[in-house]
Amino acid sequence: LGFAAVSDAAARLNRRVVSALLAAGVPAIGLPPSASAAVADGVIQALATGPVAAALEAGLLPALFGDVAFDSVRGGTIVSTEEVLGYLAHDLRPAWLLLAGETAGVLDAGGRVVPRITRATLPALLPALGGSRGTDVTGGMATKVTSMLDLSAARPGLRVRVFSGLVPGLLTRLLLAPDLPEGTELSET
């Protein structure tokens, strides 16, 4: 029952996000990873990339999210948004990944947005990168930043932006111009 309840909660949250995007004029579609993820011992082995590619080609914004997944070793597990994006990025080769959250970007110990984080600047920031305000089984901001820097190292040229999904119109502006100095850019160099 717990697995199904978590799946339901993730899907309901995604529906709220998609509804808000549609209301703001963004043609979004929710694509649940649980429908196609094959996971073994917590690691995604396969994930259908075709629906995401088709959505992008049709001019739709795939609203991807962390979700439950069946796991051949554990029975069930949670796959984070970052794990889903990491898997998809290897096949789809995006120039940018945009990660909307509750804060204006990645915050330093003083609560200020860090405009840019690279592998070289990360060690000084790690002590400030705690977990999230609520329960986050995927590791919080430190894990998000580290995994996205790992992905940008594996995919040279990939840039990632962490920004507030609560600012009206910001997602639309970033979709049109991802170089805008909003939030925090994560890149290998």
Tell me the role of every PLM-derived stretch.
Residues 3-189:
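C-terminal catalytic "cap/lid" subdomain
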